């Protein structure tokens, strides 16, 4: 019924597993043709980002669902499926002429690009652009592309963020 109504399902497996010891029947949702999105739930029980939530979904897919989802489908669930669900596919969500260049550039360590996205960790994020403008990334890249980005430090790595950029026009 959800697929027939054009609905989507937001799947937060980390939060589900921590709070309830189980998660939704995501394989059934896929079988029914539901648009599936993966994202963190909330701070106390969820992951800190979609990138981290993707790792839990991947573990569940491999160990419980017996690879019901391909790596490509899991990556779609943190990217294009979300854009499609909120009705923004005419503006962003794909690399296409005329769409906003919202991109994430990662270090490459896996031959398969979708597996690379799934296994990427915070230090692997080299650059994030929103509307073609750099907003987050490696310090050297952000210094070359922006004026005086704010430097932030993680455990064993540093990144830079442009906190002056305003992309919201009211």
Please give the residue ranges for each predicted region:
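Accessible peptide chain termini
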Residues: 1, 168-170
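Active-site-adjacent C-terminal substructures of enzyme catalytic domains
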Residues: 1-95, 104-110
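Hydrophobic aliphatic residue packing
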Residues: 34-36, 128, 170
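Active-site microenvironment of metallo-dependent hydrolases
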Residues: 76-168
């Amino acid at each position: 019924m959800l697929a027939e109504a054009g609905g989507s399902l937001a799947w937060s497996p980390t939060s589900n597993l921590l709070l309830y010891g189980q998660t939704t029947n995501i394989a059934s949702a896929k079988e029914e043709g539901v648009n599936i999105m993966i994202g963190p739930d909330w701070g106390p029980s969820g992951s800190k980002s979609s990138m981290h939530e993707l790792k839990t979904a991947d573990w569940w897919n491999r160990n419980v669902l017996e690879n019901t989802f391909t790596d490509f489908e899991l990556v779609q669930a943190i990217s294009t499926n979300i854009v499609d669900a909120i009705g923004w596919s005419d503006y962003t969500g794909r690399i296409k002429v005329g769409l906003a260049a919202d991109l994430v550039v990662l270090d490459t360590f896996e031959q398969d690009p979708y597996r690379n996205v799934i296994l990427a960790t915070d230090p692997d994020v080299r650059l994030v652009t929103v509307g073609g403008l750099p907003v987050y990334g490696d310090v050297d890249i952000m210094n070359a592309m922006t004026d005086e980005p704010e430097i932030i430090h993680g455990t064993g790595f540093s990144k830079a963020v442009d906190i002056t950029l305003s992309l919201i026009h009211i």
